[in-house]
Amino acid sequence: MAGNDWINSYLEAILDVGGQGIDASTGKTSTAPPSLLLRERGHFSPSRYFVEEVISGFDETDLHRSWVRAASTRSPQERNTRLENLCWRIWNLARKKKQIEGEEAQRLAKRHVERERGRREATADMSEDLSEGERGDTVADMLFASESTKGRMRRISSVEMMDNWANTFKEKKLYVVLISLHGLIRGENMELGRDSDTGGQVKYVVELARALGSMPGVYRVDLLTRQVSAPGVDWSYGEPTEMLSSRNSENSTEQLGESSGAYIIRIPFGPKDKYVAKELLWPYIPEFVDGALSHIKQMSKVLGEQIGGGLPVWPASVHGHYADAGDSAALLSGALNVPMVFTGHSLGRDKLDQLLKQGRLSREEVDATYKIMRRIEAEELCLDASEIVITSTRQEIEEQWQLYHGFDLVLERKLRARMRRGVSCHGRFMPRMAKIPPGMEFNHIAPEDADMDTDIDGHKESNANPDPVIWSEIMRFFSNGRKPMILALARPDPKKNLTTLVKAFGECRPLRELANLTLIIGNRDDIDEMSTTSSSVLISILKLIDKYDLYGQVAYPKHHKQSDVPDIYRLAAKTKGVFINPAFIEPFGLTLIEAAAYGLPIVATKNGGPVDIIGVLDNGLLIDPHDQKSIADALLKLVADKHLWTKCRQNGLKNIHLFSWPEHCKNYLSRIASCKPRQPNWQRIDEGSENSDTDSAGDSLRDIQDISLNLKLSLDAERTEGGNSFDDSLDSEEANAKRKIENAVAKLSKSMDKAQVDVGNLKFPAIRRRKCIFVIALDCDVTSDLLQVIKTVISIVGEQRPTGSIGFILSTSMTLSEVDSLLDSGGLRPADFDAFICNSGSELYYPSTDYSESPFVLDQDYYSHIDYRWGGEGLWKTLVKWAASVNEKKGENAPNIVIADETSSTTHCYAFKVNDFTLAPPAKELRKMMRIQALRCHAIYCQNGTRLNVIPVLASRSQALRYLFMRWGVELSNFVVFVGESGDTDYEGLLGGVHKTVILKGIGSNTSNFHATRAYPMEHVMPVDSPNMFQTGGCNIDDISDALSKIGCLKAQKSL
């Protein structure tokens, strides 16, 4: 019963603090009984610490016995009744934790089975073209690839490689784009620790941008982030542009060009007057992408005039930091057709696993709080789109990225071995993982002399160099300031494990006698004004200080500036102290590098990046963050053994250059240089004639064949006599004819020589001169509804059409043949539209100027623009096998569920007929299966669930609009996109952005479970408060007219 009595003592403590509380909303004393729900977020409950100790430390049997004991001693007193209820509650919480752990164990087992199956299938497909001897050699190749990774990285870091690198890059003039969206980002006086979004990542990206801007061969670096102009936020975060001054005085005087250097570019998106936490930024990502695309296009043109000989200088790479910026970088990479790089910093699957292991929240509750499934899907997309994924440690690769469907270390090694041998990978792709530790600028650091000859209590013999103010702010806490200082610097976050550190210090009397403890845990004015999580940690620490009577031995100053941090390190080194990072998991640990640079030995968690850091620097000890004794013993060993302390200090100072920013940037740029160069494929156009007023709307397409769009398609012979709808059934002969024509289109588009372009004689499509373009992107169950809306919109703006200021685009999942039949059935002509986005965004057509010869013109450059990581034949074979496996689940006499539709398929869209959508796997399951096999694609259920289109991973209807902006200069804000209340599974991509969106009530797909099987809820990505979104009361002419009037299109056009 000893354990049982211990539990009861904790429950008694809960009752002791369970009286009155403070209402955070009113600031007044509350007499309401405190809630015992652990997942409650509204108020801090001081009992949470005790409850969690009980749940994690004791068996369910002990908890049950406590409840039985409380129930058996029932009395009329309120205290005993509450004790019984508390026992019951805690017992149930413990059981819930076990239940969640069991469910997650089943999920992990299923994930393992799926990965093994996918790996076997991928290996079998790739083994078909190897001989028996080659198959045996593949194993050796895999081992070589695995064992040689570190060797290759060392070679890149060698003196010889660095000299070669400098000679190679000094003549280059690269443009690099970095993206970091959340938090408050500025170049000077960073407010690190102000909130959970403004942490180490902010400092990392700013310093990376600054360091890259100082490197030979880099002309300009843009760090793109969010412009914040909100009350309570400094005005500097609302400045559109901020130049980052170089830390290198030699390079700062060297003027490379007018626009050279590193800059923070703030893009306005989301609510204009509100600071938005990262979990709530997802609906506004498309708006950022559109704004960033405009900036990059303009900057590429400016750089072209300075260093590109008049041709645009496109980014060498677009580098996203964290999941939200990675999602943006993927879309930008696809729109620009340039390489993408990604750094995760903190990964969603790893965080989800950690939260579920704690047992306090279910998967649904975690998702509701952190929008974790949207974050995970963004990280999976980053694996699909990235050329390189940069990590800080090998643990991040082997234990964290390995959790994702899109990355398999074993399969990655196989693919790398095949590429080295020149053997086909059958359409499979895996991003390259590059371990490049973050850097630090050490030129300005002078390590402290670690002696006590001078007085650090604020009384110096000479007043020539007064002590920093922060020293006195810390020293005032100590009764004996000459003892070595144990320093911890972190946000007040539970995962930083600061409470365990205080407990370890408080319970080890020898350590308390030898050292002081300093906690730099953010800034605060009033604990009640802090966030719930931060105040919870701080109050727990204060309680522990009081419990162990640590007054005079622990410092916890309320305020510090970023500029004070070096002085804090110096003070700890001067006292011959130790720096500690006791976090449960530390992805890297930049503060460990900083501390080592100032001559401090370190003690750090054995989980994550510190293992690599201490392995390189050899300047400290690793500890188990869950073991208080391990923490106390390591600190005591370094503080008490002066010989060991001196050795660790010297090793750190000797090896610290391996973590410098120049070293990091050299490795970084070497990886960028290894990427296959990509840029927009269309030919440069004559900018001088771009604004020519002599080109009329009628002749603007006359010579379009001269700009490599001369692939024409005539469908006159395919029209059905008297047919009124493309839904009419076609006999097999007509279907075969259409398939042959469309296949011929695709083959011809690949074989055309796009270099033969007479730039001096170019004309431009009429779409360039439109002031407002209506994009009909409705996904209707009945084609008559789509035709009716098209005719209604055309009739509303019909009077303004002759001015040439208004245009139309049809964006659909239909094939070109189906579009042609649709237009014919409604009495419409291709010339009524400026462009046709077909097959869910995998094809782009324009109307031909010579309708008698051919009604449509294919933009074959769009094919090459979206071709990135398209699996081709290897993907098609896998999809056919998948369809066969799905059909095995049908009834004995039932028709096949999914059938390959070759008549509707093209080179960049593999189509499947779906006979029963309710039996077909969700699109997310198909994406998961493809990712497990390293096949990158975008799967879309469309046409009321009767068709499945599989297209390139970075192709979509929304990306096609961005392509039109990039190629023809059509402003994205000029688009007005008409959608229904629901649509295909790519529906969400059409909603956000700088374009106007009109949602037509009563129009949409009737397949209600289209979006029920999504990876994340629609409300997590729906920009409900966007000023660019309008919803009509219906779909008649008056409803649509009212919406267009609110948008301002009709009013603006009438004023022309």
UniProtKB/Swiss-Prot annotation:
Activity is regulated by phosphorylation and moderated by concentration of metabolites and light. GO terms for biological process: sucrose biosynthetic process. Its EC number is 2.4.1.14. Gene3D superfamilies: Glycogen Phosphorylase B. It catalyses: beta-D-fructose 6-phosphate + UDP-alpha-D-glucose = sucrose 6(F)-phosphate + UDP + H(+). It is an enzyme of class 2 (transferase). SUPFAM superfamilies: UDP-Glycosyltransferase/glycogen phosphorylase. The modification Phosphoserine is found at S158, S424. Belongs to the glycosyltransferase 1 family. It holds the Pfam family S6PP. One of its GO terms (molecular function) is sucrose-phosphate synthase activity. Phosphorylated at Ser-158 and Ser-424. Plays a role in photosynthetic sucrose synthesis by catalyzing the rate-limiting step of sucrose biosynthesis from UDP-glucose and fructose- 6-phosphate. Involved in the regulation of carbon partitioning in the leaves of plants. May regulate the synthesis of sucrose and therefore play a major role as a limiting factor in the export of photoassimilates out of the leaf. Plays a role for sucrose availability that is essential for plant growth and fiber elongation. Residues 112-132, 681-700 are annotated as: Disordered. Keywords: Glycosyltransferase, Phosphoprotein, Transferase. Residues 112-123 have a biased composition (Basic and acidic residues). This is Sucrose-phosphate synthase. Homodimer or homotetramer. Pathway: Glycan biosynthesis; sucrose biosynthesis; sucrose from D-fructose 6-phosphate and UDP-alpha-D-glucose: step 1/2.
